[in-house]
Amino acid sequence: MSPSRSEPLIDNLVDRSNLKIVALASPADGHTFPLLRIVEELVLRGYDVTFLASEDYRARTAAVGAYFVPVPPYDDIQRITTELSVIADPGERMNAAMIELFITPTAGRMATLYAALEDVKREKPLHKVVLLTESFFLGDHPLFLGAPLPKGFTRRPRAINIHACSYGLSSVDSAPFGLTIIPDGTAESREKYRKLHSDMLTGSLAESVALQKKVLTELGATNMDEVEGRNPLDVIATTADVTLQMCPPSLEYRRSDIHPKVRFIGALPPRAPPKTFSAPPFWNTVINGSKRVVVVSQGTVAVRYDQLLVPAMHALADRDDIVVVAILGQKGAELPGEVAIPSNAYTVDYLSYDAMLPYASVFVLNAGYGGFMHGIVNGVPMVLAGGSEDKPEVANRGEFAGVGINLRTGTPSQRQIRQGVDEILSNPKYKRRVKEIQLENEKMKAMDSVEKEILKWAAMD
């Protein structure tokens, strides 16, 4: 991917040798992967980057040529995800997730960020600093909201926010994020959405709204007008100077009130397999084109193979026109010994989506946003089984955009999976639509947009 030079005026105003980019990611794969891709591209384009991320990414950060700073891990993430999974009410589940995963860790991440910025200023006192954050890091929000500056700084660094997840800000045209309601555009529904937004702020989200204010105030934030009485999802995506929504507009609901700080820039393109790519033993059998390929993945976070991956293999076991590739999502992972693997299926512990999906006719997945976007950029229609975290919202967007079948459950039956796969294979509209959006995304040149924003805000400092 070659760098864009379509804004020479801005480019000429910035001395790149005097620019330091500090990238920030919360310690979860789905939030770190998109930032790591961007960090790698920035290094290739000649930028000096420090990356604050989970300890798990130390080696990968070094491999792409960036300086690494560890972010404190979640406190017992397994406990948190288990507790969240049993909360039936979507509003209450959203409230608990905001508190446990995002608001509570703010102080520790702020301390890590300030220490990193002060190190940068000591080592490179004359460099301009631009922050490249992502919506759920949150340790930068006190700084954005008027907290005292890190030592050595006389003004707040400019900040660009990467939003590599569904657009979840409050809107008159859609229900609150998490309620998984696809808007229908009617005046009656808009009135219903208005009431739902109000009820959530004073009801299920009241605790997280209050805690958000308390934590930010304790950490020195002073611009509380941007926080007072607001949904935390609105706050996290609008405190930086600009938010870059990492998808093409066609994947989101039609809204008349997109926040003025938000720019849709598309997703990064597929990544070519590295020269060191080692193909699994079944590779040539699968890619020879003699049968249609169905790729199945449970993702990397909510990994219970009995919920989707195993049922999908068995649902298609009698199809001699199909070969199934089941990606387990974790290096070294294996299915339990008692699980029978059908003769038309292959399993692999870990395999790049971008390596496998170009050969796929259907992608069956748990509707994680990262996997969903891999399906889009590779032009593969999907069967979406979203049941936890933000996955039902992602599946809704796939249905709305016309790129796949929404099973409306994270634990589909074999019959549901088979019907979804059959519908996609028999109806060309899904493939046609996903190819249209793939082309829309390619034309947006996401990485060039990220670089332009960096240069734009650096020039303003």
UniProtKB/Swiss-Prot annotation:
Domain of life where this protein originates: Eukaryota
The protein's enzyme class: transferase
GO molecular function terms noted in the UniProt entry: hexosyltransferase activity; UDP-glycosyltransferase activity
Transmembrane segments: none
CDD domains reported for this sequence: GT1_Gtf-like
Keyword line: Glycosyltransferase, Transferase
Inducers of expression: Expression is positively regulated by the cluster-specific transcription factor tenR and is induced during cocultures with the natural competitor fungus Metarhizium robertsii.
Pathway: Secondary metabolite biosynthesis
Enzyme Commission number(s): 2.4.1.-
Phenotypic consequence of gene deletion: Impairs the production of detectable pyridovericin-N-O-(4-O-methyl-beta-D-glucopyranoside) (PMGP).
InterPro entries on file: EryCIII-like_C, UDP_glucos_trans
One Pfam family this sequence matches: EryCIII-like_C
Function: UDP-glucosyltransferase; part of the pathway that mediates the biosynthesis of tenellin-type 2-pyridones, iron-chelating compounds involved in iron stress tolerance, competition with the natural competitor fungus Metarhizium robertsii and insect hosts infection. Targets the N-OH hydroxyl residue of 15-hydroxytellenin (15-HT) to produce pyridovericin-N-O-(beta-D-glucopyranoside) which is further methylated by the methyltransferase MT1 to yield pyridovericin-N-O-(4-O-methyl-beta-D-glucopyranoside) (PMGP).
Family stated for the protein in its record: Belongs to the UDP-glycosyltransferase family.
Protein name: UDP-glucosyltransferase 1
